[in-house]
Amino acid sequence: LVLLAPSWLAQQKLLNICAAAVADLDTNFNTSKSYTMIFEPFNRTRRVTFEFPSLALNASQLCVVSSFMYLGHILSASTADNDDIAHQMSLLYARANVLIRKFSKCSRNVKLCLFRTYCTNFYGAALWKQYNATVLKRFKAAYVKCVKMFFGYDRMYSVTAMFIELGLPVFSTILHNAKCSFVASISVHANSVVRVVHAVCAYP
């Protein structure tokens, strides 16, 4: 469950409504696993205050965090995607190491099938919009390094020639395809609210 509100008071009212609703169902929230996050404005000169009263749920104060993982995607109070990109990069290294350890002796065709399945899908990549260029460059370098290690290429081998020989998508192609697929899916989504939000974001 995610609650979004434009002000502290509105957020507290939503929490009170939720607490009353679950009380009617004779159940309760696990406040130890409930968190609150205050998103920073894009224009920091318009920030009203740097401190807010603690939000409470069932008379328990909620912990304020600067980042939180929700449905596999790391959300940051600064709305930047650097943390999520770094997380996906670490997952790529982990998956590549497993493939190298267990399937290094397989044929190239088998390796290509495995690599396409496990190392060319970056969860949430279609949502990346605000990030430091250096963070994405490190991720790109990590992707190239994983390809060279798994397929046994020398570290000084031409990256362009390697991808042409293997027929694998380059890093920028993976990101582009992810965004195109995401936009195509939400533009025909069955939920009218999702379609309206997409239309507003696409044509501000």
Regions found by a protein language model. Give the residues of each.
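Short, intrinsically disordered, charge-balanced linker/junction segments flanking boundaries
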Residues: 116, 201-204
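Short secondary-structure boundary/capping segments
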Residues: 18, 46-47, 52-53, 134-135, ...
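Catalytic palm subdomain of template-directed nucleic-acid polymerases
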Residues: 1-24, 40-46, 76-81
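Secondary-structure transition/capping motifs at alpha-helix termini
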Residues: 21-28, 153
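Short, conserved micro-motifs composed of acidic
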Residues: 28-66
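Non-catalytic, peripheral interaction segments enriched in hydrophobic/basic residues
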Residues: 30-35, 39-42, 67-196
